[in-house]
Swiss-Prot record:
Belongs to the universal ribosomal protein uS19 family. It comes from the Bacteria. One of its GO terms (molecular function) is structural constituent of ribosome. This is Small ribosomal subunit protein uS19. PANTHER family: RIBOSOMAL PROTEIN S19P FAMILY MEMBER (PTHR11880), SMALL RIBOSOMAL SUBUNIT PROTEIN US19M (PTHR11880:SF8). Gene3D superfamilies: 30s Ribosomal Protein S19, Chain A (3.30.860.10). Keywords: Ribonucleoprotein, Ribosomal protein, RNA-binding, rRNA-binding. Transmembrane segments: none annotated. One of its GO terms (cellular component) is cytoplasm.
Length: 92
């Protein structure tokens, strides 16, 4: 279900403040965040944001195509190791 248009996009205030501070000083630093729920804004373009996936921070370089998506979409939190193998082949 999509978010209501009257509410607008969500971004954590502390993350937005960090990115705006970097934009004012023209620095390119990695910003660590645990906020997977934040929407990517146009101000984030060109920055690298390290998004926490439950074990480590995954660096995500923000490009124009990512605007409007959530940060958590680019840092998968689950590792898929395949289905369990079928042992019928080894029994023969």
């Amino acid at each position: 279900m999509a978010r209501s248009l009257k509410k607008g996009p969500f971004v954590d205030d502390h993350l937005m403040a960090k990115v705006e501070k970097l934009n004012e000083t023209d620095k390119k630093q990695v910003v660590k965040t645990w906020s997977r729920r934040s929407t990517i804004f146009p101000q984030f373009i060109g920055h690298t944001i390290a998004v926490y996936d439950g074990r480590k921070h995954v660096p995500v370089f923000i490009s124009e195509d990512m605007v409007g998506h959530k940060l958590g979409e680019f840092a998968p939190s689950r590792t898929y190791k395949g289905h369990a193998s079928d042992d019928k082949k080894t029994r023969r």
